[in-house]
């Protein structure tokens, strides 16, 4: 049969309806299916109730020919997705030997006792293509029944994502009769808004065919996912590189890395490569910048130390900010930011000193509204200060400040 093109995703789990977790699986699956030309028209969420799940399945069957389920494949009594679908299709559940062996091996390896309920996880709908689970116990499956496909996937994203990418997607492409190689890369940008990036690349995005270009903004950053497909993998790579070059020619000044990297990871790499050390004086960020830097192994090679300087006493007595500066300009000022950066650099003997002073909110301070911040940098005997007006929550402003700190030092290192 021709592979269906009208897909629906059904997320199963009462925790979704209670707002305890977000349905990130549907977003992920939709993106993955779009890359291979399968259109998702509906997202549905339903609780752990077999009767309501049956109702949702009947509705989906009236409007979709490819139904994907996530969740409800576990060993507990409320994990009923598999049983409900098998009952709806009139198919028995059978034991999958490979899955059962994998579960047994896991319990032997961890020296735990396997309960009878765990056997349930190795059951699959008869006649299904089984999707191996290398990061959990319950296998997934793809079942064809009366001109429709039903795909069952585990709920935990740490299991669902690798299963879909490594097992489900290749199987779907095979069912579709495609020998095309699909390759994606993500370009990461900071310091430019999504609307401005899209405006700068409007003609490229409007004309996209192969590769496709998917913008996404989150946490003050913008990413572009480029996805190309071709029977020849080298040609796929060429298509990606060609489009990437055109994009970076226009907005390359805001580009900082690929795929799953981050600003702080790129900063750590750059500092280690150049033998540069950093120190930080943090007021409104409250040590967040220092925490991020020390989250990575080998941080002692690049991070000399940090001071959380919330009070003016610490700014003066530890970091050497002049009393006259605080009296005349206040703690939230470019003058204070400059002296803080210089002071922490001198205190630690680092190559670069960075300071963060401002108002994280929710209340105004010294006549400054929340989000009004200054970031100072001291390096090579010079100080520079950058002023920003951020919007958002207290946590969001702190994160935005710490990210801009990484961004500014990266730009400084590019000049070296």
Swiss-Prot record:
<dbReference type="InterPro" id="IPR001453">
    <property type="entry name" value="MoaB/Mog_dom"/>
</dbReference>
<dbReference type="InterPro" id="IPR008136">
    <property type="entry name" value="CinA_C"/>
</dbReference>
<protein>
    <recommendedName>
        <fullName>Putative competence-damage inducible protein</fullName>
    </recommendedName>
</protein>
<dbReference type="InterPro" id="IPR041424">
    <property type="entry name" value="CinA_KH"/>
</dbReference>
<dbReference type="InterPro" id="IPR036425">
    <property type="entry name" value="MoaB/Mog-like_dom_sf"/>
</dbReference>
<dbReference type="Pfam" id="PF18146">
    <property type="entry name" value="CinA_KH"/>
</dbReference>
<comment type="similarity">
    <text>Belongs to the CinA family.</text>
</comment>
<dbReference type="Pfam" id="PF00994">
    <property type="entry name" value="MoCF_biosynth"/>
</dbReference>
<dbReference type="InterPro" id="IPR008135">
    <property type="entry name" value="Competence-induced_CinA"/>
</dbReference>
<dbReference type="InterPro" id="IPR036653">
    <property type="entry name" value="CinA-like_C"/>
</dbReference>
<dbReference type="InterPro" id="IPR050101">
    <property type="entry name" value="CinA"/>
</dbReference>
<dbReference type="Pfam" id="PF02464">
    <property type="entry name" value="CinA"/>
</dbReference>
